[in-house]
């Protein structure tokens, strides 16, 4: 039996379960299973295309009395073709309808990159100049309305986060980014901590959709060594590293056994002598998002510009 999920406190005072469930490419049955196992933070996004399915699960489990809405922490994300201020509230309204809830606990700008309204997926001709300041003001209005209990960003570099902090009336509660032992984001961590922004790590075990990437994390020699010494799986060690580093983690799995395993990270810790070994792991970013950069059509001409060199 997994220990109760612990929390990180956001700058709004809200408590964010420190192990959440990533829902990209997840089916309803797996999400229902995860909630029944004990997951309470569900990380959604409109672009994932499954918010209606998730909404059906939420309605069923809340209606059956298995879980109360206030016990769940639901995150969703604004897609890049809805960045115009007039489109932001419409996008959240669609998400709320699909999820069959009255509010989200956290709403994020998914990428600091914009697409033309008629485009869903990023192609060179559909890339357009982002105006994050205007988009953020619309996000702040959603926060004021209570339909988004907290607002934040995703995939923002240190520079982009700093630029936003310089103009924001409401400080972002979260910056959700790729983070795992092979991409530790130390500089971004320090910035977020100094500004009261919680860092949340997606792909904490590497990307499930890219097997070779997952292996680079879970078969890393240092991660493997620590797991063997502690009698834990490499996945548990990677997740526990994240929690001890100070960020929430968003693993995803459709396997009941793995879902339980990923929650079993609370009643033990990585000793300091082993924890320091993680600083010796060579760093490599896996999610590069090359589709948001283009030398002719893109606002970001290169991925170095997209990530401001943090790549």
From Swiss-Prot:
One of its GO terms (biological process) is response to salt stress. NADP(+) binds at residues 23-24, 43, 110, 154-155, 176, 203-208, 252-254, 258-262. Pfam families: Aldo_ket_red (PF00248). SUPFAM superfamilies: NAD(P)-linked oxidoreductase. Induction: By drought, salt and cold stresses. GO terms for molecular function: aldo-keto reductase (NADPH) activity; NADP+ binding; steroid dehydrogenase activity. GO terms for cellular component: cytosol; endoplasmic reticulum. Its EC number is 1.1.1.-. InterPro entries: AKR (IPR020471), AKR4C (IPR044498), Aldo/ket_reductase_CS (IPR018170), NADP_OxRdtase_dom (IPR023210), NADP_OxRdtase_dom_sf (IPR036812). The active site is at 48 (proton donor). Keywords: Acetylation, Detoxification, NADP, Oxidoreductase, Stress response. The modification N-acetylalanine is found at residue 2. The keyword GTP-binding does not apply. The keyword Oxidoreductase applies. Belongs to the aldo/keto reductase family. Oxidoreductase acting on a broad range of substrates: reduces ketosteroids, aromatic aldehydes, ketones, sugars and other aliphatic aldehydes, and oxidizes hydroxysteroids. May function as detoxifiying enzyme by reducing a range of toxic aldehydes and ketones produced during stress. This is Aldo-keto reductase family 4 member C8. It comes from Arabidopsis thaliana. The gene is AKR4C8.
């Amino acid at each position: 039996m997994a220990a109760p999920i612990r929390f990180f406190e956001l700058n709004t005072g809200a408590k964010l379960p420190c192990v959440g469930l990533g829902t990209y490419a997840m089916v309803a049955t797996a999400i229902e299973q995860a909630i029944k196992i004990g997951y309470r933070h569900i990380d959604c996004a409109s672009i994932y295309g499954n918010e209606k399915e998730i909404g059906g699960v939420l309605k069923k489990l809340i209606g059956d009395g298995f879980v109360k809405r206030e016990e769940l922490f639901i995150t969703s994300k604004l897609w890049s073709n809805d960045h115009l201020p007039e489109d932001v509230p419409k996008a959240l309204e669609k998400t709320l309808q699909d999820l069959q809830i009255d509010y989200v606990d956290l709403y994020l700008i998914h990428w600091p990159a914009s697409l033309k309204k008629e485009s869903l997926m990023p192609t060179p001709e559909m890339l357009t100049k982002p105006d994050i300041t205007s988009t953020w003001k619309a996000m702040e209005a959603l926060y004021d309305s209570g339909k988004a209990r907290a607002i934040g960003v995703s995939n923002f570099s240190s520079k982009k986060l700093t630029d936003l902090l310089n103009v924001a009336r409401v400080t972002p509660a979260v910056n959700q980014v790729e983070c795992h032992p092979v991409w530790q984001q130390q500089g971004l961590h320090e910035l977020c901590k100094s500004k009261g922004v919680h860092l949340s790590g997606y792909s904490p075990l590497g990307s499930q959709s890219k097997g070779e990437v997952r292996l680079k994390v879970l078969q890393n020699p240092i991660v493997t060594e620590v797991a063997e010494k502690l009698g834990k799986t490499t996945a548990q060690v990677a997740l526990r590293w994240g929690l001890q580093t100070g960020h929430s983690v968003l693993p995803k799995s459709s396997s009941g056994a793995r879902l339980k395993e990923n929650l079993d990270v609370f009643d033990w810790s990585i000793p300091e002598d082993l924890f320091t070994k993680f600083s010796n792991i060579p760093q490599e970013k896996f999610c590069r998002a090359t589709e948001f950069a283009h030398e002719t059509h893109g606002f970001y001409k290169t991925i170095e510009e997209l990530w401001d060199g943090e790549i």
